[in-house]
């Protein structure tokens, strides 16, 4: 494209400096962005463009060499701007531990009753837990039984069992008066004596068939023996006939 067409074309547009924004990019130094601005148009020249590109290449060359020499990779903004990123906003960075300790001490000094209130709250919480864990809250199954009602089976001594057996053989059924006398003599309650006699009568009924009399088994044996004798006599008669 010849200069005849290029010069009128660039004359219609503004120069590059007028179009440059007021802010600058952190990736490039301010000196590179403003003093060596690229000017296009009739007033521009090729050496100016080469000079600016030379500065940019030098900047990136030095910046990358500094980054490679350091132990970690840094942001180019911190290298090209004011150097230290902690001083960019106008204050110096403080170590976190010391800052935290200072804040903690300041809060303690500012609120002296904080520690005492915390101790009181912890003591109240422990007291509340102790109250909840106290045996005052008892469920029905945790309550002890009444002294008159004992759970489980009653165990009788050999002497008590012997005396009760004697009384049972004498009379399986006890009157109220006799039950009181036996209970006082053996150190038992009327209910215990009554239950023992009931169980003993059930045991006797299981051992002895209640539907038959005590001599019923003997009668059955006699009948069986008589039937056997009759069968033998019939066999002897048949042999004699033959």
Swiss-Prot record:
Chain intervals with Polar residues compositional bias: 116-136
PROSITE patterns listed in its UniProt record: ANTENNAPEDIA (PS00032), HOMEOBOX_1 (PS00027), HOMEOBOX_2 (PS50071)
Keywords, sorted A to Z: Developmental protein, DNA-binding, Homeobox, Nucleus, Transcription, Transcription regulation
Alphabetized Pfam families for the sequence: Homeodomain
Compartments where located: Nucleus
Residues within the DNA-binding region(s): 149-208
Segments for region (Disordered): 114-154, 206-242
Keyword DNA-binding: yes
Xref: InterPro entries: Antp_homeobox_TF, HD, HD_metazoa, Homeobox_Antennapedia_CS, Homeobox_CS, Homeodomain-like_sf, HTH_motif
BP GO terms, sorted: anterior/posterior pattern specification; negative regulation of transcription by RNA polymerase II; neuron differentiation; regulation of transcription by RNA polymerase II; skeletal system morphogenesis
GO cellular component terms given for this protein: chromatin; microtubule cytoskeleton; nucleoplasm; nucleus
Domain of life: Eukaryota
Biased composition range(s): Basic and acidic residues: 206-220
Major subcellular site: nucleus
SUPFAM superfamilies, per the entry: Homeodomain-like
Motif Antp-type hexapeptide mapped to chain: 138-143
GO molecular function, one term: DNA-binding transcription factor activity, RNA polymerase II-specific
Record field: compositional bias (Acidic residues): 221-242
Family: Belongs to the Antp homeobox family.
PANTHER family: HOMEOBOX DOMAIN-CONTAINING PROTEIN, HOMEOBOX PROTEIN HOX-C8
Subunit structure: Interacts with HOMEZ. Forms a DNA-binding heterodimer with transcription factor PBX1.
Task performed by this protein: Sequence-specific transcription factor which is part of a developmental regulatory system that provides cells with specific positional identities on the anterior-posterior axis.
Protein's recorded name: Homeobox protein Hox-C8
Species of provenance: Homo sapiens (Human)
Lineage: Eukaryota, Metazoa, Chordata, Craniata, Vertebrata
